[in-house]
């Protein structure tokens, strides 16, 4: 570990320890220290896990609470220190004169230059460019704004301390260092006395606010900045013919994802859309206010355009002190109009004061953009480019990036849910008594007829629909209302999860038509919403291209696609495919599905846009975004990629401006490189794909033999992980299962992966791979040759390299000695011992196979920074796990007093914070 980083972690840890001793008493501090020292001894091989178990055996739950909080706070502070040093090292690397590191725009520009990429190629990519991080809710990301604020202040103080320590000794004063430490201590004291998590189950509205918090922390500033930087640099390098598209345009599922979540309603759609719009409109007002203050330019000192003079005269600011300051008068009027816009769209209660009431609201973003362009043009006319390129340029970029909607809210529902609603609508309208009972061909005929006619299916008045149907219709109604208010980009996507047929994709189109989001016109419907199938099981991934081919053979749908710029978005489900088939089989099924989709779209002249439903963990498609995008097949990106971001990953990526910039830059860099640079040429592509297919099949068999076929597996999983507690302790707003069944198939992906992460098995990220590789390599004469084949693929094929690297990353965070403690919670010892031994054996076989193929001695040999990070976290992960096991044991024995469930929640949050990608 970097010495400065180690010093910072020790420094913050020392202050935290002193705060704990002061606030909780020396006995609590000693208990924390004893646990920490014991964990270090275990890490160094000087003690066994039992010694830490003894520390907490029989502990009073009330005494366990401050210990769990202590290690959670230490994880928070360690993360803060790591982020600070990552940003500093990145800055140092960029300013060192050495070649810029991968995943930076500087490196991307060099690669494009070296490859001789022309302006025509760039223009074609940028014309359709879209890089969309889509924020989704997550049960472990429940930290309060107070905690974020404290982290922000501590980060700023640590930066100030670094600057001071970098000065020569004679140029800094001890008193200033003491002041900084006093302020850090005060912030940590406030943090210690603040509840880290809320006890009540979070409402959808709470989750919306958590998502919006990241915009205020970083995204409102950093998304416009990176879009501006990319636009300026592309124009400089490739000329003025490059479209000025805002590449990064964010999305959200929070409040619109009602797949299996009964708490998403018409009201949450309204809340999510209105709060998003309110956030961005108030941001514009704030920036206009700052511009009004800054642009004190006098028309006695420079020339202004006629358009600006007209704008200034309409600004309703006749103060004598402003008479010669046209920019201030113009922007005053723009601010008044933006406040009036906020009042008109959100409500007057959202705006302080009444002075804006004499102004006319902006009718749309184009009017606001026209005014901003007038100010920009006037400044440039008078050679004030340096002024125009600052705050005004960022505001113009913000408008291009966010519009009046901030983000695009996706609607998502399970295909069965859409079918249920239509079955009831058709029956009530006496169009078809039993839609669900029709054949696929009969359903198709009926759906096409409905989409061809403007006649509404829902009668006027108050039809007697079921509660579920009314909820669904309410969601669509409020989505349509939001589009009318905030523009078509407010709700531009409708996702069908578990899509497995053509009718699954057409069914929501009928509902969209009912509310005007699609308009019937015979065989030529028009609309503002992309209908997106989500292929998420292994079988559906394999059949996805065939389903789309059938869909595109329907004239009505193909015509709709053409008026949507011929773009077909497809979402790929990393989570459910992994749960269905295991890590390797899912990764190959996804890659193979992309190959088929790319080939199909190329042949049918359709623009493919892929939406990657990745979670934070490798078991849910996680891993470095830059590497993941570059590992896609050629043609799968083409300037556009959408990807889900959730949980601790959102906090880690977008919790402060520096990390937000770094991660947004990685997404943009990878998208440009994947779209414009030649693909890696495999020596024998057909053979490589054959190998992957064979290993995938072997891995699937091994995974299925445990997860789907072993009769004791469900018992092992439900009793050796905190799954039961996730379901019963208000962890997240969404139920943990789609249906009230006791099967892996119906369990949601987040609790599936979160449970294995908490118990430190990380099973979804590796199980089955070791056996598959060993069986494929075989024994005897051909084994060495097959190992050599795999080693060559690892060297030259980003897909295979990424699969192995991500697997190694997640395996490095597993701890099988802890998994044994969780297995001991199972009453049936035969099941506990047998399945634990199966998992234990597969883990070490997988590690052995990884080392054989990569030539490594250990899992993270090629990533020493991550290896050091994982090792440094070990001492505060262990106590959290051991406390969690002890509390789970008591909770399941009937101890439901306040402290026991509270400690389970605390340890879940602490482990998620420390692991940084637990679900």
UniProtKB/Swiss-Prot annotation:
InterPro entries: PEP_COase, PEP_COase_bac/pln-type, PEP_COase_Lys_AS, PEPCASE_His_AS, Pyrv/PenolPyrv_kinase-like_dom
The keyword Manganese is assigned to this record: no
The UniProt record lists the keyword Magnesium: yes
Gene Ontology biological process terms from the UniProt entry: carbon fixation; oxaloacetate metabolic process; tricarboxylic acid cycle
Enzyme Commission number, as recorded: 4.1.1.31
Catalysed transformations (reactions): oxaloacetate + phosphate = phosphoenolpyruvate + hydrogencarbonate
UniProt-recorded Gene Ontology molecular function terms: magnesium ion binding; phosphoenolpyruvate carboxylase activity
Cofactors required: Mg(2+)
Keywords: Carbon dioxide fixation, Lyase, Magnesium
Active site: 138, 579
Any single Gene Ontology cellular-component annotation: cytosol
Cited function: Forms oxaloacetate, a four-carbon dicarboxylic acid source for the tricarboxylic acid cycle.
Family: Belongs to the PEPCase type 1 family.
NCBIfam families documented for this protein: PRK00009.1
Protein name: Phosphoenolpyruvate carboxylase
Organism in which the protein naturally occurs: Corynebacterium efficiens (strain DSM 44549 / YS-314 / AJ 12310 / JCM 11189 / NBRC 100395)
Gene: ppc
């Amino acid at each position: 570990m970097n010495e400065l980083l180690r010093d910072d972690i020790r420094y913050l840890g020392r202050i935290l320890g002193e705060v704990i001793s002061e606030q909780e008493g020396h006995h609590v501090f000693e208990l924390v220290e004893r646990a920490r020292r014991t964990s270090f001894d275990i890490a160094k091989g000087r003690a066994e896990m039992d010694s830490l178990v003894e520390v907490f055996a029989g502990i009073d739950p009330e005494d366990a609470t401050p210990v769990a909080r202590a290690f959670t706070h230490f994880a928070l502070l360690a993360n803060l220190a790591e982020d600070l040093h990552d940003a500093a090292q990145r800055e140092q690397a960029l300013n060192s004169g050495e070649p810029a590191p991968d995943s930076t725009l500087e490196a991307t520009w060099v690669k494009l230059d070296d490859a001789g990429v022309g302006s025509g190629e760039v223009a074609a990519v940028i014309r359709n460019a879209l890089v969309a991080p889509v924020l989704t809710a997550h049960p472990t990301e429940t930290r309060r704004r107070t905690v974020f604020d404290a982290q922000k202040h501590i980060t700023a103080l640590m930066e100030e301390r670094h600057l001071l320590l970098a000065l020569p000794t004679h140029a800094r004063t001890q008193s200033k260092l003491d002041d900084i430490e006093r302020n850090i201590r005060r912030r940590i004291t406030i943090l210690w006395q603040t509840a880290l998590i809320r006890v009540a189950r979070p409402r959808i509205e709470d989750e919306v606010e958590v998502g919006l918090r990241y915009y205020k922390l970083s995204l409102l500033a950093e998304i416009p900045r990176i879009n501006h930087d990319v636009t300026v640099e592309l124009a400089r390098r490739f000329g003025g013919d490059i479209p000025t598209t805002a590449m990064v345009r964010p999305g959200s599922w929070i409040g619109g994802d009602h797949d299996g979540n009964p708490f998403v309603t018409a009201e949450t759609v309204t809340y999510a859309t209105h709060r998003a719009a309110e956030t961005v409109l108030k941001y514009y007002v704030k920036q206009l206010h700052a511009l009004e203050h800054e642009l004190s330019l006098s028309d006695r000192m420079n020339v202004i355009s006629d358009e600006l003079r007209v704008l200034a005269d309409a600004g309703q600011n006749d103060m004598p002190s402003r008479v010669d300051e046209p920019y201030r008068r113009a922007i005053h009027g723009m601010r008044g109009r933006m406040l009036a816009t906020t009042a008109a769209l959100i409500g007057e209660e959202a705006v302080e004061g009444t002075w804006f009431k004499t102004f006319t609201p902006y009718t749309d973003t184009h009017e606001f953009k026209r005014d901003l362009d007038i100010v920009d043009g006037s400044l440039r006319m008078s050679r004030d480019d340096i002024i125009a390129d600052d705050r005004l340029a960022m505001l113009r970029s913000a408008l291009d990036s966010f519009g009046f909607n901030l983000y695009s809210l996706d609607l998502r529902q399970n295909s069965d849910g859409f079918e249920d609603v239509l079955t009831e609508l058709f029956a009530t309208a006496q169009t078809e008594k039993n839609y669900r009972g029709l054949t696929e061909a009969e359903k198709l005929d009926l759906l096409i007829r409905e989409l061809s006619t403007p006649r509404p299916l829902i009668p006027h008045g108050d039809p007697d629909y079921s509660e579920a149907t009314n909820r669904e219709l309410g969601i669509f109604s409020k989505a349509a209302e939001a589009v009318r208010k905030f523009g078509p980009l407010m709700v531009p996507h409708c996702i069908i999860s578990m899509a497995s047929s053509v009718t699954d994709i057409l069914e929501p189109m009928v509902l969209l038509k009912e509310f005007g989001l699609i308009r019937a016109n015979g065989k030529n419907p028009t609309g503002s919403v992309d209908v997106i199938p989500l292929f998420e099981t292994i079988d559906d991934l394999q059949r996805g291209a065939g389903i789309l081919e059938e869909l595109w053979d329907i004239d009505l749908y193909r015509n709709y696609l053409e008026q949507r710029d011929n773009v077909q978005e497809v979402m790929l489900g990393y989570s459910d495919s992994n749960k269905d088939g295991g890590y390797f089989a899912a990764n190959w099924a996804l890659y193979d599905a992309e190959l088929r989709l790319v080939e199909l779209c190329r042949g049918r002249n359709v623009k493919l846009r892929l939406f990657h439903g990745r979670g934070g963990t490798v078991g849910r498609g996680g891993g470095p975004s830059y590497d993941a995008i570059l590992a896609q097949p050629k043609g799968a990106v083409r300037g556009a990629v959408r990807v889900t971001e959730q949980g601790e990953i959102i906090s880690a990526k977008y919790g402060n401006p520096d990390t937000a910039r770094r991660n947004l830059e990685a997404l943009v860099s990878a998208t440009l490189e994947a779209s414009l640079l030649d693909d890696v040429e495999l020596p024998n592509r057909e053979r490589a794909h054959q190998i992957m297919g064979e290993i995938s099949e072997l891995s699937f068999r091994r995974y299925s033999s445990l997860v789907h076929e072993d009769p004791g597996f469900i018992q092992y999983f439900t009793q050796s992980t905190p799954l039961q507690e996730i379901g019963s302790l208000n962890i997240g707003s969404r139920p943990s299962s789609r249906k009230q069944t006791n099967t892996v198939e119906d369990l949601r992906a987040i609790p599936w992966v979160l449970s294995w992460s908490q118990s430190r098995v990380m099973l979804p990220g590796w199980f089955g791979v070791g056996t598959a590789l060993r069986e494929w390599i075989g024994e005897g004469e051909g084994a060495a040759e097959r190992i050599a084949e795999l080693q060559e693929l690892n060297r030259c094929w980003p897909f295979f390299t990424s699969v192995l690297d991500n697997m190694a990353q997640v395996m490095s965070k597993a701890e099988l000695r802890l998994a044994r403690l969780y297995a001991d919670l199972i009453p049936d010892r035969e099941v506990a011992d047998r399945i634990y031994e199966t998992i234990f054996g597969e883990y070490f076989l997988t590690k052995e196979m990884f080392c054989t193929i990569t030539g490594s001695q250990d899992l993270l040999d090629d990533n020493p920074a991550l290896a050091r990070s994982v090792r440094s976290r070990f001492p505060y992960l262990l106590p959290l796990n051991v406390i969690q096991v002890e509390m789970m044991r008591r909770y399941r024995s009937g101890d439901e007093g306040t402290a026991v469930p509270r400690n389970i929640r605390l340890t879940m949050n602490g482990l998620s914070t420390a692991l940084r990608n637990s679900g």
